[in-house]
Design a protein with these regions (language model features):
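Active-site-proximal loop/helix segment associated with metal-binding centers of metalloenzymes
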Residues: 8, 50, 64-150
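Core catalytic region of metal-dependent phosphoesterases/phosphodiesterases
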Residues: 1-63
Length: 151
């Protein structure tokens, strides 16, 4: 995982994977702090533990008549136009590029014909901060300030 060493510990997920199933259906997309070597095995999505479903790098699922679309990853202008070239064990910068969203994942979703009820992404939509208290947000998370200013 591409995180500081203090976060490289097995935490709650192992509990749900091995011992205690999640009590409700949990659907997620990948971001920049997931174990991408594990999620790569589920490129198209799939069950990662009992009652926990990974939506894949991009995809649409139907849950009780509700259509949910999602895209994993974070935006990187350097990898946006590339394909997925990373292989495990990750070498060099691959540990970071593995979780970058690719343009073709968005293009695949744009081909979906039927309406989508819910869209899930890891990255915030542009200008979402216009609908929040930016002062409080940047006081709690100062590193967001630059992202907000740059859209």
């Amino acid at each position: 995982m591409s995180v500081p060493p203090k976060y490289r510990k097995i935490k709650d997920f192992a509990k749900f994977y091995y011992d205690k199933p999640m009590s409700v259906l949990t659907i997620f997309v990948g971001g920049n702090h997931e174990a991408m070597n594990y999620l790569q095995e589920q490129y198209y999505g799939g069950w990662v533990a009992q009652n926990i479903y990974f939506m894949g790098y991009s995809g649409v699922i139907n849950v009780n008549g509700i259509r949910i679309a999602g895209v994993s990853g974070i935006h990187s202008k350097y990898d946006w136009k590339k394909g997925h070239f990373e292989t495990y064990p990750f070498a060099g910068g691959q540990i970071k590029s593995a979780f970058h969203t690719r343009e073709f994942e968005i293009m695949k979703l744009s081909l979906v014909k039927d309406p989508i009820d819910i869209f899930v992404s890891h990255d915030w939509p542009t200008i979402i901060s216009n609908h929040s208290n930016v002062k409080i947000l940047t006081r709690i998370k100062p590193h967001f300030d630059k992202d907000i200013r740059n859209n």
